[in-house]
């Protein structure tokens, strides 16, 4: 799928404000209301994988004789527009904005409260 995306004429890599390790809350879809940590971001598809959210079961056949098959449960990706950054301290969701501090370092903060993220 990534190859087909790269071959499109107007293909653009989407810049994501959500990073790996951020705590997010699902705001849309069947998993709405759940919170979790971002395990992986996929910028080419504008998707994120969140720990404990959007679980899928995968049936794995035995690869060798004598080995039994398994049923694995793993997280599937969500579209990045369906999640928002979640502040555990204030217990609210907010958009993220970038700014440059006095030392000239680019940082992230919450738009609603101004709380620094990193």
Swiss-Prot record:
SMART domains registered for this protein in UniProt: KOW
InterPro entries (alphabetical): KOW (IPR005824), Rib_uL2_dom2 (IPR014722), Ribosomal_uL24 (IPR003256), Ribosomal_uL24_CS (IPR005825), Ribosomal_uL24_KOW (IPR041988), Translation_prot_SH3-like_sf (IPR008991)
Keywords of this entry: Ribonucleoprotein, Ribosomal protein, RNA-binding, rRNA-binding
GO molecular function: rRNA binding; structural constituent of ribosome
Any one of the GO CC terms: ribonucleoprotein complex
Ribosomal protein listed as a keyword: yes
Keyword ATP-binding in record: no
Gene3D superfamilies (UniProt xref): 2.30.30.30
A Gene Ontology biological process term: translation
Record NCBIfam families: rplX_bact (TIGR01079)
Role description: One of two assembly initiator proteins, it binds directly to the 5'-end of the 23S rRNA, where it nucleates assembly of the 50S subunit.
PANTHER family: MITOCHONDRIAL RIBOSOMAL PROTEIN L24
Family membership noted in the UniProt record: Belongs to the universal ribosomal protein uL24 family.
Quaternary organization: Part of the 50S ribosomal subunit.
This protein's name: Large ribosomal subunit protein uL24
Organism field: Prochlorococcus marinus subsp. pastoris (strain CCMP1986 / NIES-2087 / MED4)
Lineage summary: Bacteria, Bacillati, Cyanobacteriota, Cyanophyceae, Synechococcales
Gene: rplX
